[in-house]
């Protein structure tokens, strides 16, 4: 299910008997927080954190996607410096001009891990404004 979006199709296999046939397997990383860092030309233009929707009720904290009651928020979001650093490094290594990097932070070992780079991230609200401003500056330099 490599063409899925929004975290749909995720299966957590806690033991070998839970495995299902698929095209991609990845290790689960315990996390305290999950962030989306929007980057253009090496600069952070927007920072969001995944949070439980107020009306979500009981949720599965391992799979933090929209269908499971999570949304991206930007109010009062502060991340460890390593979250921004690994996001910028991932963009640099991938040679992409812009994208939204999903990063989880494990506070037990104080490490940030890149989950993926979204090359066509969903944009709405203030994120659209931030991208428009950043692209204007980028194209006018």
Regions found by a protein language model. Name each.
Residues 1-35, 40-45, 77-85, 138-141:
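Active-site nucleotide/adenylate-binding loops and adjacent lid/helix of ATP-dependent enzymes
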Residues 7-11, 56-57, 126-129:
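Short, charged, surface-exposed secondary-structure boundary motifs
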Residues 43, 47-54, 117-122:
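Short beta->alpha transition motifs characteristic of CBS
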Residues 45, 60, 113-115:
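Generic structural signal for well-ordered beta-strand positions
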Residues 54-77:
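Flexible internal linker/loop segments at domain or repeat junctions
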Residues 80-88, 111-114:
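Short amphipathic alpha-helical surface patches that serve as generic macromolecular interface elements
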Residues 92-96, 105-141:
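C-terminal active-site "lid" helix and adjoining low-complexity regulatory extension at the edge
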Residues 101-103:
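Hydrophobic residue at the +6 position relative to the catalytic HRD Asp in the kinase catalytic loop
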């Amino acid at each position: 299910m490599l063409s899925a979006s929004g975290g749909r199709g995720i299966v957590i296999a806690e033991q070998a008997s839970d495995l299902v046939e698929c095209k991609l397997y990845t290790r689960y990383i315990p996390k305290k927080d999950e962030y989306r860092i929007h980057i253009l030309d090496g600069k952070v233009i927007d920072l969001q954190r995944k949070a439980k929707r107020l009306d979500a009720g009981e949720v599965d904290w391992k799979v933090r996607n929209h269908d499971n009651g999570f949304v991206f928020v930007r109010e009062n979001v502060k991340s460890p410096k390593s979250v921004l650093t690994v996001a910028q490094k991932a963009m640099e290594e991938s040679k992409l001009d812009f994208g939204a990097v999903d990063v989880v932070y494990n506070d037990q070992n104080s490490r940030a891990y890149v989950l993926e780079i979204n090359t066509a991230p969903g944009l709405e609200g203030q994120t659209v404004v931030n991208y428009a401003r950043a692209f204007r500056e980028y194209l006018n330099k």
